A protein has these predicted regions:
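A structural motif corresponding to the C-terminal lobe/cap of the Radical SAM core domain
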Residues: 1-150
Length: 151
């Protein structure tokens, strides 16, 4: 709270939160040990201070279920309507812990040595690529209906 107030007093006009999920189970499973309620409180506070606020949601974390994704959507109803939401699939990049998980699940490391349609691969351990893109579209549609998606 105090940091947001100081940021605003210093002239901060826009902030982007890497929330990733509003489902506590998912956050803890990927080492993001914070309470989604606190994230929502800070998002709402930023808006109330007049700071343009954006957050991201990531689809496709390992072990994430449909119920977890629905929980994130339901919880997003508790944040201010002026918060823009960016929805992405889970990318994997060398050096990240999720990259090591993908390798253990059979991701072919030679991907980086060949040409692909997508510069950065999506991790599809929890969902097929088509399912992931379907959920991204579903989430974007949900947020468009609330007039707060930012692509």
């Amino acid at each position: 709270r105090e940091l947001l107030i100081l940021l605003r007093q210093a002239g901060c006009q826009k902030i982007f939160y890497g929330v990733d999920s509003l489902c506590e189970k998912v956050l803890y499973s990927v080492g993001r040990k914070y309470d989604p309620s606190l994230a929502m409180e800070n998002l709402n506070l930023a808006v109330s201070l007049g700071i343009k606020t954006e957050m991201n949601i990531i689809i496709g974390f390992p072990g994430e279920t449909e119920r977890d994704r629905v929980e994130t959507l339901k919880n997003s109803g508790r944040i201010h309507k002026d918060i823009d939401v960016v929805v992405n699939g889970l990318w994997i990049l060398p050096g990240a812990e999720i990259y090591e998980m993908a390798l253990r699940d059979g991701f072919n490391e030679s991907y980086w040595l060949s040409e692909h349609e997508e510069a950065i691969p999506f991790y599809t351990g929890a969902l097929s690529k088509d399912e992931m893109h379907g959920w991204i579209r579903r989430c974007e549609s949900y947020f468009v209906l609330q007039q707060r998606v930012h692509k």
